[in-house]
Amino acid sequence: MIDSHELKRRDSYLNKLIGFQDTEPVKVITGIRRCGKSSLLKLMVQHLKDTGIQPEQIIEMNFESFDFRRMNADDIYRYVKERIVPGKRMYLFFDELQRIEAWEDAINAFRVDFDCDIYVTGSNAYLLSSEYSTYLSGRCVEIKMLPLSFREFLDFHGFEVRETQSALGGLRKQVFDKNSERYELREVFDAYMRFGGMPGIADVGLEQEKALSLLDGIYSTVVVRDILEREKRRGQKQITDPTLLRKIILFLADNIGSSVSIASIGNTLVNEGLLDDGKRKGAPSAHTVQAYVNALLESYFFYEIKRFDIKEKAYPRTLGKYYIVDIGLRNYLLGFRNRDSGHAIENVVYFELLRRGYDVAIGKIGNAEVDFIATTADEKKYIQVTESMMSEDVRKRELAPLQSIRDNYEKIVLSLEPGLDTSYDGIKSENLIDWLLSE
């Protein structure tokens, strides 16, 4: 087991947790398997100890452990009650709590019966379902955790970005590893696009065979434990076909950033002979496919993005898009090759915007489309993503939707053009890698 003092800090998440310390809401950390939730709990425990909280005030339960996985809500309550220190505030940490049936009863009882600060992780959105909210009367705060950003990837893998001076006096960013070996920034970014941001990759190194093994374990756990087994525990009968589930995963992974309808998924799988060795004639019902897609969204394997009509200021009932939580998982599923790199970098930008706290939608402006509208309570940005702006045709295509938007919010085109930092009639054009490193 890795001790907390050996864990890499992820300050953006840890600082959020610390900011909610000793407040009434239950702190709920959500995200796909193996994205770092358990490590974040350990870092929070270490923070408490470093700031004077005594070890006996801290109770940790990991429901992946054999010691706890067979417990029910009553068992959990008794376990905690026996360890309460009279007159002291207790800090309760529950990892992968969604495995326990009726866990909501125990959490609500702790809030009522004890002076405690509660932290929970879960790998399924069921943790924040309507049933859960009812039990806690809305008294919870969600920390949404994602795989590593590009900046975190550099840190976890021991890379450091430095500005170096060329013989002609110009400055450029280069990357150095722990052995002072030098790499071009684009080379390391390509490694990020290849292996993805699952923290465990840093433990096995940037070697394809080891990375594939780790990603296979994550994929299998999500499919088997977080979807198929959970459906059985809930007594649901909608998701019963592992083959159909895997085929839908492959379809969505292959179509990230493309407009997708639920009906088109089933029809494509049948038309291309991908179900029952091509023997199946009829497509699965839209209701069935929707249930499978919902399960993938609930497990944080895929994220759905809706369209927003900029002129009408409304969300029309039109097709959305899906993005995969980690580009390394996509490469594991579809093969390590240069496929559809335009949508792949879109995928990276989408999740970076989520990390930075934006609500993200696709922009519709007439018949044109803006890749992303990113909004917060007091900020809005329109963002286009493309591999290159060198071609005049591409420039016109990417700039036209932004030029047709009649407001004064920031408009940006991100591309992989090196050293790019220019403007087209007030529309900023930035290098994507520099943008990823900018915050």
Predicted ranges, named:
Residues 208-379:
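Accessory nucleic acid-recognition modules appended to NTPase machines
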Residues 37:
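Conserved lysine of the Walker
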Residues 59-88:
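Short glycine-rich substrate-engagement loop in P-loop NTPases that contacts/grips substrate
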Residues 29:
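Hydrophobic anchor at the beta1->P-loop junction of P-loop NTPases
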